[in-house]
Amino acid sequence: MSKPQAPRRVGEKEALAVATTVRGSSYKLNLVAGLIRGKKAGEALNILSFSKKAMAKDVRKVLASAIANAENNHNLDVDALIVKEASVGKSIVMKRFATRARGRSTQIIKPFSRIRVVVREQEEAE
């Protein structure tokens, strides 16, 4: 007896990819994610490949994973995919301490973020 299949978290013609612990602030990641929202998937990959932002590499990996999920798991046409959603949120925070003068210490915050990319197959306009 197999496990019951989990319900889909996205629509019928959509595919999803998530990265839960990406090292970097959500503000910087959101600047990069804003570049690809609403774009065609191939165009978005090109934008991220040639971006000078350091966070573009992480967003590109998640987008490539979403495209691969669409092709392999949901049998969607890769050439007709558009980026429906590219959202960024906060994840865990790693806290470290640095020593300071006079025997004191200060806290260093190292933020992590999560990226969620949804691609959708665009219907051809007739």
Swiss-Prot record:
Gene3D superfamilies, per the entry: Ribosomal protein L22/L17
GO cellular-component term (any): cytosolic large ribosomal subunit
The entry's keywords: Ribonucleoprotein, Ribosomal protein, RNA-binding, rRNA-binding
CDD domains, per the entry: Ribosomal_L22 (cd00336)
GO biological process terms, semicolon-separated: translation
SUPFAM superfamilies in UniProt: Ribosomal protein L22 (SSF54843)
Chain segments annotated as coiled-coil in the UniProt record: none
Origin: domain of life: Bacteria
GO MF annotations in UniProt: rRNA binding; structural constituent of ribosome
Family the UniProt entry places it in: Belongs to the universal ribosomal protein uL22 family.
Its biological purpose: This protein binds specifically to 23S rRNA; its binding is stimulated by other ribosomal proteins, e.g. L4, L17, and L20. It is important during the early stages of 50S assembly. It makes multiple contacts with different domains of the 23S rRNA in the assembled 50S subunit and ribosome. The globular domain of the protein is located near the polypeptide exit tunnel on the outside of the subunit, while an extended beta-hairpin is found that lines the wall of the exit tunnel in the center of the 70S ribosome.
Subunit and interaction comment: Part of the 50S ribosomal subunit.
Protein's name in the database: Large ribosomal subunit protein uL22
